[in-house]
């Protein structure tokens, strides 16, 4: 992955992120990152089929979940589940074997959404939903999260596309904290599942993967559109420790290229769901307007970043902030 923070460029294996997110899908980006080239039509078909045939997890994982409290943080559950994968799939933990490394990669890509959906279902006391191999990657994940056994679940193409873009935009981001953690763990010869578990533990931090959660909590703290000027003034005050979450980026000194796509996606989702009376989303939209026009934000290039829009989009899709 290549990043030019000054020009606002993000490339996966030489391909601009906007092209991959708009014209392709997440599994196409996975293939690109794994093999270095975009797949042919047949290669894409075979890869998709391979991934979707590995979405089931060992049935004992259901019992594994019952060892957690219902209010456990989902990242704590994911760290444990990913580490446990090495106990369930010990035929793909030899990192010196290229074939085992590839099998581990396929298993991680295919099974992590299933485990994440199980973590969500467990937290709200609902029955686990098994994956369906005839659905797309993103549609499968949304169905596992939000369907219930007592009624049908309709696949919404706009929401599915939004989820797929979120996956694509977060697939890789150069040598960030979680990637560095995975590589450091891997340098000791640890198995792929343990390494990814370490990466997820790093991703848990509020300065990394927790940024969109922190952004939504900030919107909750603001509380109403009328209070926005007060918090804008605090953000401009050097002596006030308050920071506007979801604005600016440590790497991108220009507009975050992922944010442009996520902004469009966010508005597509809000329009599709006809969301007009959510106070948090009202605050977010007003903050967006101010940040794109206020001289202070424009001069300092504090544009809304990918976490700002992805947090709002995920909330609109139905995912709770926590």
UniProtKB/Swiss-Prot annotation:
It catalyses: oxaloacetate + acetyl-CoA + H2O = citrate + CoA + H(+). Pfam families: Citrate_synt. Its EC number is 2.3.3.16. Pathway: Carbohydrate metabolism; tricarboxylic acid cycle; isocitrate from oxaloacetate: step 1/2. GO terms for molecular function: citrate (Si)-synthase activity. Gene3D superfamilies: Citrate Synthase, domain 1, Cytochrome P450-Terp, domain 2. The active site is at 249, 307. InterPro entries: Citrate_synth-like_lrg_a-sub (IPR016142), Citrate_synth-like_sm_a-sub (IPR016143), Citrate_synthase (IPR002020), Citrate_synthase_AS (IPR019810), Citrate_synthase_bac-typ (IPR024176), Citrate_synthase_sf (IPR036969), Citrate_synthase_typ-I (IPR010953). It is an enzyme of class 2 (transferase). One of its GO terms (biological process) is tricarboxylic acid cycle. SUPFAM superfamilies: Citrate synthase. Transmembrane segments: none annotated. Keywords: Transferase, Tricarboxylic acid cycle. GO terms for cellular component: cytoplasm. Belongs to the citrate synthase family. Citrate synthase is found in nearly all cells capable of oxidative metabolism. This is Citrate synthase. It comes from Bartonella taylorii.
């Amino acid at each position: 992955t290549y990043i030019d923070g000054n020009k606002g460029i993000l490339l996966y294996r030489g391909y601009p992120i906007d092209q991959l997110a708009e014209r392709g899908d997440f599994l196409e980006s996975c293939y690109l990152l794994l093999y270095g080239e975009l797949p042919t039509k047949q290669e894409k078909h075979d890869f998709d089929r391979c991934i979707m045939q590995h979405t089931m997890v060992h049935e004992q994982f259901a019992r594994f979940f019952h060892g957690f409290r219902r209010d456990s943080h989902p990242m704590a559950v994911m760290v444990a589940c990913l580490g446990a994968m090495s106990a369930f799939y010990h035929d793909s933990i030899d990192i010196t074997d290229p074939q085992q490394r590839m099998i581990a990669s396929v298993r991680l890509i295919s099974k992590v959404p299933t485990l994440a959906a199980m973590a969500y279902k467990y937290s709200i006391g609902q029955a686990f939903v098994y994956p369906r191999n005839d659905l797309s990657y993103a549609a499968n994940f949304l169905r596992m999260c939000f369907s219930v056994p007592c009624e049908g679940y309709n696949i919404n193409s706009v929401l599915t596309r939004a989820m797929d873009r979120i996956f694509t935009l977060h697939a890789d981001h150069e040598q960030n904290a979680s990637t560095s953690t995975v590589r450091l763990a891997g340098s000791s010869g640890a198995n792929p599942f343990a390494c990814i578990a370490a990466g997820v533990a790093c991703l848990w931090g509020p300065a990394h993967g927790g940024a969109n959660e922190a952004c939504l909590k900030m919107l909750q703290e603001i509380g109403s559109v009328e209070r926005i000027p007060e918090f804008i003034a605090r953000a401009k005050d050097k002596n006030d420790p308050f920071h506007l979450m979801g604005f600016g980026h440590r790497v991108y000194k220009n507009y975050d290229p992922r944010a442009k796509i996520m902004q469009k996606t966010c508005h597509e989702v809000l329009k599709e769901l006809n969301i007009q009376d959510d106070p948090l989303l009202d605050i977010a939209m007003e903050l967006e307007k101010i940040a794109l026009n206020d001289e202070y934000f424009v001069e300092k290039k504090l544009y809304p970043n990918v976490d700002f829009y992805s947090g709002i989009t995920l909330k609109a899709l139905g995912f709770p902030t926590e």
